[in-house]
């Protein structure tokens, strides 16, 4: 996946900058187990294990959310596009946080760019989106982390499909290309997917503009930089969250009843503040379906 370091002039000072692994994953109590690895040279693959620790999923595939007041019009538009893409193709649902929701995601604009925790953490958890992250692909990628997904190229079988060109990687960034043991990366028996929205692109963390990863089958194949879920991504989400097959929603079900819905959704917090009304009359613009 195309990783962009991104910064904003307006920062949300109330949120401390977290320690990150693999560029955009928050290192917390649960993911800390995942980065414990055995000693070996930086150029060899190291398997990482998560003993007795499980990533928590969201109940009934429902994600309560809050969008920061500092998120501008562009950010709100892109977040809602990501909601629509996921809701249309899977059973995942995004609804504004209500008083009875204890666990929820807050989308913020912070100094350190794009990042998310893995899975449901309990209480408020942050998805950070800076200027360079405000496109649909980046937002979906970070939401997928929050849904419980690691990077595709961290899979235990990665080296069968991808060759890592260690000599082209920026010094000190080699740790971003280590692979996990079979657990905690749960591929739910789906094949390795070069076109997953969770896969780095060919030149991720390149020190010289050359490829850092290549397909073993076709070194010239370009991957990463995807803007939408791949078919394998959809299958994995469907299995992980026990979604109905096909998804319970369809394009024909999702529409706006007012011509100004898109404007309301993009320029205000109407989707959140007037949820019951907007759910009925502007469900598509708000990304509720």
Residues of each region from the PLM?
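Amphipathic alpha-helical interface elements that mediate macromolecular binding in regulatory proteins
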Residues: 3, 77-84, 196, 232-235, ...
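Residue-level detector of conserved, well-ordered beta-strand and adjacent loop positions
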Residues: 66-68, 108, 128-130, 165, ...
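Surface-exposed beta-strand-to-loop junctions
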Residues: 56-63, 119-122, 212-219, 262
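Amphipathic alpha-helical protein-protein interaction segments
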Residues: 72-75, 133, 187, 223-230, ...
């Amino acid at each position: 996946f195309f990783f962009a370091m991104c910064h904003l002039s307006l920062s949300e000072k109330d949120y401390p900058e977290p320690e990150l692994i693999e560029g955009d994953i928050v290192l917390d109590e649960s993911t800390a187990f995942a980065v414990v690895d055995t000693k070996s040279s930086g150029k060899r693959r190291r398997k990482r294990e998560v003993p007795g620790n499980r990533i928590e999923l969201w109940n009934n595939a429902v994600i309560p959310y809050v969008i920061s007041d500092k998120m501008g019009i562009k950010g709100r538009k892109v977040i809602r596009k990501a909601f629509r893409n996921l809701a249309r193709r899977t059973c995942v649902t995004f609804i504004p946080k209500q008083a009875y929701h204890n666990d929820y995601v807050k989308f913020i604009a912070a100094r350190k760019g794009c990042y998310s925790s893995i899975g449901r953490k309990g209480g408020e958890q942050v998805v950070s989106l800076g200027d360079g992250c405000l496109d649909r692909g980046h937002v979906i990628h970070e939401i997928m982390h929050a849904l419980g997904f690691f990077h595709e190229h961290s899979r235990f079988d990665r080296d069968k499909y991808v060759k890592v060109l260690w000599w082209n990687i920026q010094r000190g960034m080699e740790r971003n290309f280590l692979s996990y043991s079979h657990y905690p990366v749960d591929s739910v028996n789906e094949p390795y997917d070069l076109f997953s929205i969770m896969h780095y692109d060919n030149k991720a963390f390149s020190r010289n503009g050359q490829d850092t990863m290549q397909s073993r089958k076709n070194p010239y194949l370009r991957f990463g930089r995807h803007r939408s879920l791949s078919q394998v991504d959809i299958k994995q989400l469907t299995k992980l969250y026990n979604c109905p097959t096909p998804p319970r929603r369809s394009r024909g079900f999702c529409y706006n009843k007012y011509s100004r819905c898109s404007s309301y959704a993009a320029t205000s917090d109407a989707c959140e503040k007037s949820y019951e009304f907007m759910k009925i009359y502007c469900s598509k613009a708000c990304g509720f379906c």
